[in-house]
Amino acid sequence: MSSIKWKSKDAASCIIIPSELDHKYSRGTLGVITGSAQYPGAAVLTTSAATATGLGALRFHSSSGLAHLVLHQSPEVLVQPGPVTAWLAGSGINSKRFSDITTWLRHRWFVLLDRQSVPTLLDAGALHLAGSLEQPTLITPHSGELSKLLAQRGVIASAELIESNPSEWAMKASELLAVTVLLKGSKTVVAQDQYLIELPVATPWLATAGSGDVLAGIIGALMATNYIEILNDSKRLADVAATGAFIHNRAALIASNGAPISASSIISAIPKAIGKILA
């Protein structure tokens, strides 16, 4: 199985630089359904990471007072429904559909994913939708989540087995579910049909709470700005996912400089990471 080793020049090709003719809506709008009463920080981290990555606008679909938290951190976020060019759904949402009223309210928004059929990222509590949407779809599980997702389709593979050969299992999941798969781990891989991308080994400091939410926000923003390219090129979604992971690791390295980091510090380093990639 051949693969592509993702490099800075590859990532640069997926970062859309605005022209003097662009305005906020021409640059792409990301619709975000993340966070819950149990994990309110996911709403803040995903939206903050997306806005730091650069896009025209972001629409946050709220419940349970999450809008207040998001707007306090990112007042530029829109909190009313409207047209979007990509979706990010599931981060910080319980996978058990109706475990509490907040989870029910978050899942209620998922019906919009079908109504606006644009490139969609499914994470955490939205992974169960993998394979059910017609639009280009990316899932971003870690090995444990992928193990559960495969088991629901009758394929038994432990998290440990998946971690022993992430490339093989990401490819199998992509074929089984007919989606693009970004399998998170120290060795992150992206698979789409027979197309496989391997990312550089990530800094171990990325093993911190909320870093996956930051990754989802970065990729979501890139999907929103690349939506035309994704719809016109079957491999573009995989390239965009790999670019998001590449930016994520670069930002973590900048934030860390050999020391511990938090998810929030990764977000602060995103613009500098993108600048270095484009330099």
Where are these regions (language model features)?
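Small-residue (G/A/S/T)-rich helix-start motifs and N-terminal tracts that mark the onset
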Residues: M1-L121, H128-Q135, K148-A279
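Non-cysteine beta-strand/loop elements that form the S-adenosyl-L-methionine
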Residues: P136-G144
